[in-house]
Amino acid sequence: MAELKNDRYLRALLKEPVDVTPVWMMRQAGRYLPEYKATRAQAGDFMSLCKNHELACEVTLQPLRRYDLDAAILFSDILTVPDAMGLGLYFEAGEGPRFERPTDTIDAIKKLSIPDPEDELGYVMKAVSTIRRELNGAVPLIGFSGSPWTLATYMVEGGSSKTFEKIKKMAYAEPMALHMLLDKLADSVILYLNAQVANGAQSLMIFDSWGGALSHSAYREFSLRYMQKIIDGLTRFADGRKVPVTLFTKGGGLWLEAMAETGCDALGLDWTVDIADARRRVGHKVALQGNMDPSMLYAPIPRIEEEVGHILAGYGEGTGHVFNLGHGIHQHVDPEHAGAFIKAVHAQSKQYHK
């Protein structure tokens, strides 16, 4: 593998000195870019794009051609794992992801098998190795998965949900069934992420998009417990370097201390968290990633630059901060505004790394 030319993202996650604060954007390969839309049209639909390793590589690299980003993230979807379990993933126009066969009974859960990442998910591994080769050491490659709880919400609900009624009913009326599902998902995610590292991923991220829907105690029981199991099972060294792991629970500001105890290297913060407060609470243990409101990219460029300065000042001096949005970039954002955001992070952060 080519030697890494820009490792500031990995260094910041491990709280090693950097020259400027590294920056990347969740969903940086996405619909706000005209070149992404053209490639997606070429693929036919979203999952065809994910399953074609050459096109998945192309869209992963597109934002790096435009912007001075400090990391690339694998272009894929969190629902690849349940899809590989045979649930029949499809996308309904305007409805988002759906499953033909929801996992909403204990019998359905018992029948689930753990997918082989090199077989049923081989297309993801091919994408990882292709992207790593094509990056040629320019920046690190981030691999990722959804958290067991978040994957389970889609599997039990049969798709997206605003109320999470079915999975919460299972959690409280049939907790053993849900624990069986979460356990299988944790085992699947461990294999999946370790295979991504074996194929070239240099950092890992676990997206717990719906952990914030849980009560204070239920979060620990049904989400954090299984992310802990994953972290305990991950490959943490490859190519002679540590493979940093970032946990991100959207709406997880209540639980930063508990998340920091898992042994992860960094916590992702959504835009509702004050980064200065987060650093006071857990900055001695973990790095922090975040956390500008993605909607701020609709603001005039001087306002974006002002907000970048505010967040950098909130974190303060020294390493341990990876700048990002608090969630994925919106599809109608002007690419110029995204570019101004990235430039502002690098330009304004030098003063914090003397």
Curated annotation (Swiss-Prot):
Pathway: Porphyrin-containing compound metabolism; protoporphyrin-IX biosynthesis; coproporphyrinogen-III from 5-aminolevulinate: step 4/4
PANTHER family documented for this protein: METHYLTETRAHYDROFOLATE:HOMOCYSTEINE METHYLTRANSFERASE RELATED, UROPORPHYRINOGEN DECARBOXYLASE
Catalysed reaction, written as an equation: uroporphyrinogen III + 4 H(+) = coproporphyrinogen III + 4 CO2
GO BP: protoporphyrinogen IX biosynthetic process from glutamate
Lineage: Bacteria, Pseudomonadati, Pseudomonadota, Gammaproteobacteria, Alteromonadales
Assembly notes: Homodimer.
Localization annotation: Cytoplasm
Organism of origin: Shewanella baltica (strain OS155 / ATCC BAA-1091)
Protein name (Swiss-Prot/TrEMBL): Uroporphyrinogen decarboxylase
